[in-house]
Amino acid sequence: MSNENNNLSLYGWSDNLFRQKQISQYKDMSHGRIIVTHKTCYEVVAEDGVYLCELTGNMIYGRVPDEYPCTGDWVIFQPFDANKGIIVDILPRERALYRKKNGRVADRQAIASYVDKAFIVQSLDDNFNVRRAERFIAQVMEEKIKPVLVLNKADLGCDRQKIDEAIKHIARQFPVFITSIRQPQTILRLRESITKGETVVFVGSSGVGKSSLVNALCGKSVLNTSDISLSTGKGRHTSTRREMVLMDGSGVLIDTPGVREFGLAIDNPDSLTEMFEISDYAESCRFSDCKHIDEPGCAVLEAVHNGTLDHKVYESYLKLRREAWHFSASEHEKRKKEKSFTKLVEEVKKRKANF
């Protein structure tokens, strides 16, 4: 761990975070931001260096897994023994990106917090999948994070007309960048879109070049990358942890491991209408609570039938809506159980205090 002076405002520290810290019972202790999440510990950048921190027992056993710290969280910790510490509190999360864990249970996994933008990275080869891009965008918008589609490895050659046609409904709503680390001007345009103090998380499948993009944006090698496989022409999975790096004179970048599946953790399925431009037509539906599935007088269905709304986009909306509905229903039931668990924990604490 390093000993250095860090300007935490470059990492996003603000007056609002300071006020939140004053509410904590641990307000007189050190604070910092988690820059790397390991399996059982965390690297926390503070004003006087980087600390390797663990959690207190109360935090481990008094919280559900999706409330454990994640990369990007601002935490309060007690330093000890030369750049080591114990995390005692987490400041309230904002703009946290989650995904549904694999499996049938509605468990969420926190990927990163205090995120301003999400760079949704796909490579212009066999990895390109507009339906997968829509899935990432849906989750990002749920958390009030700005989605940006980054189509990487443009040097591989692709049918640009076909790509443009596939993403036109995305490009009408969100920024789209075509990039290649072998084409510096494309990296420059992407870098110019990141402002000072802004936090950007990179998400996407394995081998799309997320770590290489982070290195290119920083102008130096800050993350490990792998060579291209000669047999497949694809990058190998490199990132194994969620890691934050600071750009010189600009924002904060968070690299994440590639994912094979990205399950939706959306509480309100109705929010999907905004992403798919369905809300543009929904205003003309006969019923204000129309779900745009089989209701009479549905302007959305009419737009699909007359070709104004792409039927593939509409089918994607239905699929994601069903998935979001199942998650929200399961999440509601799970939260009732968690409330009972929280009451039990508080009761145990009270009993201990009385002994």
From Swiss-Prot:
Alphabetic keyword roster: Cytoplasm, GTP-binding, Hydrolase, Metal-binding, Nucleotide-binding, Ribosome biogenesis, RNA-binding, rRNA-binding, Zinc
Keyword GTP-binding among UniProt keywords: yes
Annotated Gene Ontology cellular component terms: cytoplasm
Cofactor binding description: Binds 1 zinc ion per subunit.
Biological processes annotated in GO: ribosomal small subunit biogenesis
Role, per record: One of several proteins that assist in the late maturation steps of the functional core of the 30S ribosomal subunit. Helps release RbfA from mature subunits. May play a role in the assembly of ribosomal proteins into the subunit. Circularly permuted GTPase that catalyzes slow GTP hydrolysis, GTPase activity is stimulated by the 30S ribosomal subunit.
Oligomeric form and interacting partners: Monomer. Associates with 30S ribosomal subunit, binds 16S rRNA.
Protein name, entry field: Small ribosomal subunit biogenesis GTPase RsgA 1
Originating species: Bacteroides thetaiotaomicron (strain ATCC 29148 / DSM 2079 / JCM 5827 / CCUG 10774 / NCTC 10582 / VPI-5482 / E50)
